[in-house]
Amino acid sequence: MIEKSMPAQNTHAADADLIGPDKSLLIVDDDTAFLRRLARAMEARGFAVEIAESVAEGIAKAKTRPPKHAVIDLRLSDGSGLDVIEAIRGRRDDTRMIVLTGYGNIATAVNAVKLGALDYLAKPADADDILAALIQRPGERVEPPENPMSADRVRWEHIQRVYEMCERNVSETARRLNMHRRTLQRILAKRAPK
């Protein structure tokens, strides 16, 4: 167990021991400042970091050298991080992947987990949260959130889940939710509630 009084470099050395022998980490995010900051923080914790700023670059790096660990933003400027997850999983089935999302869209995050991601974290996640998620052992319990979702947020997430299940078909989603199509379009156009 790491004591809080340990110096930072000893803590990071202990982190490196928890990572395992293959320390490769691919971080895919189109927010350059966040990407570089996270890459430095994860290198300090013992990872051998490679970065990609797009889906295309992430897939290319995954094909060239499939990583043991990956942190992937869900929404990238040229597409979905789900494509990077599929590319990694197609090359290496033991990769520990975490999905980052600035939108907190549970339906899409569930799809990411089904494709092989371990977990998803809301942005901006800090390096310690990401490290904890990457090294979490199977069966370990994660602390529940201190402030659960509001009723409006739960409704939004349900609508998003059905929307994803209907392959983003507004008319079909509206029919399944017993809602007028224009009402659904207005809801989807708004930002997610807190």
Swiss-Prot record:
It comes from the Bacteria. Keywords: DNA-binding, Phosphoprotein, Transcription, Transcription regulation, Two-component regulatory system. Member of the two-component regulatory system ActS/ActR acting in acid tolerance. These data implicate that a two-component sensor may be involved in pH sensing and/or response. GO terms for molecular function: DNA binding. NCBIfam families: ActR_PrrA_rreg. Phosphorylated by ActS. The keyword tRNA processing does not apply. The modification 4-aspartylphosphate is found at D73. It holds the Pfam family Response_reg. The keyword Transcription applies. Transmembrane segments: none annotated. PANTHER family: PROTEIN PILG (PTHR44591:SF14), STRESS RESPONSE REGULATOR PROTEIN 1 (PTHR44591). SMART domains: REC. InterPro entries: ActR_PrrA_rreg (IPR047772), Bact_response_regulator (IPR050595), CheY-like_superfamily (IPR011006), Sig_transdc_resp-reg_receiver (IPR001789). The gene is actR. This is Acid tolerance regulatory protein ActR. Disulfide bonds: none annotated. The lineage of its organism: Bacteria, Pseudomonadati, Pseudomonadota, Alphaproteobacteria, Hyphomicrobiales. Residues 24-138 form the Response regulatory domain. GO terms for biological process: phosphorelay signal transduction system. It comes from Rhizobium meliloti (strain 1021) (Ensifer meliloti). CDD domains: REC_RegA-like (cd17563).
